[in-house]
Amino acid sequence: MDLSYWEQKEWLENIDFAIVGSGIVGLSTALFLKQRFPESNIILLEKGILPQGASTKNAGFACFGSLSEILQDLKTHSENEVLELVQSRVQGLQLLRQSLGDASIDFRAYGGYELFLEKDSAVYENCLEKMSEINALLFSIFKADIYHLVVDRFQFSKVK
């Protein structure tokens, strides 16, 4: 990249914080750094003109984990660690919504669905078997059962 003298002088000197990526994580980091260190010079670096990561492609930041993801987490983490992880995800979303406002990010809490292909029947059966147990585990966070069985909601073929 060829930068002019002025671009180098204005953009790339006296930087206190350099953040790579201008998706939700990068922008949130810049916002909170600026709030904590108002006199700091912060630069956001992005590979292209627009962000290219997950922030522009899905609403994964608004999810705390599907049933199969929570079950997978429990294979490598304790119940308390998984609870802390889910709680952190929920708090992160609450902080984002408080910081930016639901209207400005067009946030709508529609919920989510986990779809299982017919070839994933073992995972599907495991989720059905463990659903009540995971709902009980997460009840302290959500004060309600959050996972429910919905059959053929979208009428996709080869999907459970």
Model-inferred region functions:
Residues 68-74, 98-160:
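Flavin (FAD/FMN) cofactor-binding and adjacent substrate-gating region
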